[in-house]
Amino acid sequence: MTRRRWLAASVCAALSTLLASSAATCAARADAVQGSQAPQAPLLIDAYGDSTTLGITCHDGHCGPQSQNAVAYLQDALRAHHGDRVQVTNLGVGGTTATQLRDGTGNRRAGPSAGLPWRERLAASPARIVLINYGINEVMQNQTPEQFYTAETTLVKTARALGRQPVLQTSNPMPDNRLNARLAAMAAMTRRVAEEQQVPLVDQFAYISGLPDWKTLMSDGAHPKPQLYRLKAEQDYQVVEPLVRRKLDSMP
């Protein structure tokens, strides 16, 4: 082989090696980019509360949970804005109070963690935001506003200590004037806790009480019709969505 041919062969070999190396580097970078674009785990929100969280509606004397409830409507609204990056779980249990949630003495059939005290239950949950909606059963079970205040304060303090974002909700009003006056005192306690602990509040009691003919949107003495559940979800969304946006922006 002449020197010229040897040089040409050497150059070709070097170019082949360089091209192969460049191709491998590009492939590795493509794999890295693809890996960095893997789907994020969704931001989880847990909604705790009574039957108005669960979504009970009554018709012709028959009451039961409906798919058209405030939590479902909130999920739909968040999904429309953020896609599948947000997931809301309805953990409402009929007939329960904030004290029962705190102590883990609610309906154990509601799930494997329903019988756990609040701290243990929340520590086991991956949810980043927790919605808390109570007040009606406190009235029906003759609790005092002070007892309710103590329970909700503990729920909020524990949630924050565990790195969760609590959001308090006042109950929707009740058509019975006597019961509603007592419920107003419970709503005042929820507002007090929200102010003292500096946590977000959805004041459903005040909002719904200001609606004209709001009683026509109730299916019985405590539970909204689907139309009112949708209105409640709109109020929830105004408070919850900015929290969701900030948390999504901070997620890796």
Language model: regions and residue ranges:
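N-terminal export leaders
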Residues: R3-A8
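Bacterial N-terminal signal peptides
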Residues: S10-S21
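Serine-esterase "nucleophile elbow" of acetyl-processing enzymes
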Residues: A28-G92, E120-A124
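Structural recognition of the beta-strand scaffold that forms the well-ordered cores
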Residues: L44-G49, T53, Q87-G92, R128-Y134, ...
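Oxyanion-hole/transition-state-stabilizing segment in secreted/luminal serine hydrolases
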Residues: L54-D60, V93, Q100-Y149, M174
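Active-site segments of SGNH/GDSL-like serine hydrolases
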Residues: L131-N137, L155-A185
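Charged helix-capping and loop-helix junction motifs
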Residues: P145-T153, R182-A187
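Catalytic His-Asp segment of secreted/periplasmic serine-dependent ester chemistry enzymes
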Residues: P173-P252
